Amino acid sequence: MPDFARRWDVLVAGGGNAALSAAISAARAGASVIVAEHAPVPMRGGNSRHTRNLRALHHRPTEVLTDSYLEDEYFDDLIKVTAGRTDEALARMTIRASQTAPEFLKSCGVRFQPSLSGTLSLARTNAFFLGGGKALLNALYREAERLGIAVLYDTEVQHLAIEDGEVGEAIVAHRGFPERIRARTVIAAAGGFQANRGWLGEYWGEAADRFQIRGTPYAQGGVLKDLLAQGAQQVGDPTQFHAVANDARAPMVDGGLAMRLDCVPFSIVVNRDAKRFHDEGEDLWPKRYAIWGRLVAQQPESRAFAITDSQAIQDFLPSVFPPIKAETIGALAVQLGLDPALLEATVGAYNRAVRPGRFRPTELDDCRTEGLSPPKSHWARRIERKPFVAYPLRPGITFTFLGLRVDDHARVLMTNGRASANLFAAGEIMAGNILGQGYLAGFGMTIGTVFGRIAGEEAARLART
């Protein structure tokens, strides 16, 4: 039975990578730590269950990373995907600290492997977890247990009582029963509100009911909403989220990484009216895959279709659900519920606009269109080899960008301009400080690890004084 009478040094709200990085760092610094994880054991870990890698600065090749990936290139990649919507000081701090993130995770028992082959082409920039997100979490929870960290599962943090900028106690529901947890410091690491369709609906209307939730159903945003209501500063656009082009046949909740479709750069993508609406070859897929969920969400009925042919199948990771195939574009349209004449016209116009070049699937090649709007800037090849292939798309939402504003000590800033006396934040709940829009593959895990470590160390230091 948990000791609810005890006063802990550090309470961590959340149970994913950011939360465990914080809890472990605090415990290693000598603090007594309790973790409140909303999910039961089989579902523990939030979206970290579905992750694969983190993006890390490195000056030379490592056991799992090729070449080098330095600060200026890293920051330039971030600026491109966010269009400058980032706090540069926090971003650069995160990038620099990412250099030691893999070693920290290794010290927790996490093992790494070289990049997998596929469309994302991350061998130089991202370190992959051996066994994926579940193996990562299992290692972190084992380390937490070894350090004597108390973990409460099925425990929803419903209210963090703030007075004069300081959290006094947490009101929780532990296995359905109300309890209180007292702690000298609190770290909010409970994620965003991507699984809360009601909250999403405030910005997206009925379209939110058609979004597929890629990860945990427990990301309801309760801690975030509670803290914003009590004067924590808001950061990030509430309409922005990380979302990918998911297979429309995927589960509506918790489908994970495998439901993402990586065929977009080697296809044309049309909406319900069989019209293209964006440049499919705009940039390398790791810098663009996270905009496609939003693009699809903006289409009629939040639906789209990737159209390609048999020559492209080998250029991207295979889908869980089989592709839809037909011997003619018209027959393919019938299977998709599209107007055959309109799809034939769209494919025909695209084929006529293609200017062949040297096709290089992992680089920005010179295969492009000319005189077509929207253009296809790279990887443009005529769709002409039978059978023709299609994949139905829906937006798969990963996390939201609305969050808590923090400083470089991971302290939550209040609307009066001051930092909270004892409240810190890490992970998706504060990622909007650095990711104002767009995404870099693996960077969410980097933010969670870096700010989790900072929050844990700072909370432990404060609790001891």
Residue ranges and their predicted role:
Residues 224-226, 230-344:
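An anion/pyrophosphate-binding glycine-rich loop and adjacent beta-alpha core
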Residues 342-433, 437:
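A glycine-rich dinucleotide-binding beta-alpha-beta segment and adjacent secondary-structure elements
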Residues 4-18:
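Beta1/beta-strand and adjacent pyrophosphate-binding region of the FAD-binding site
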Residues 14, 183, 189-190, 272, ...:
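Short, well-ordered coil/turn residues at beta-beta hairpins
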Residues 44, 94-178, 182-184, 195-199, ...:
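Conserved redox-cofactor binding core of oxidoreductases
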Residues 174-247, 454:
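Glycine-rich loop(s) and the adjacent beta-strand/alpha-helix scaffold that form part
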Residues 223-230, 444-462:
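An active-site-proximal "capping" alpha-helix that borders the catalytic cofactor pocket
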Residues 32, 38-150, 159, 267-276, ...:
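Conserved N-terminal/central alpha/beta ligand/cofactor-binding core
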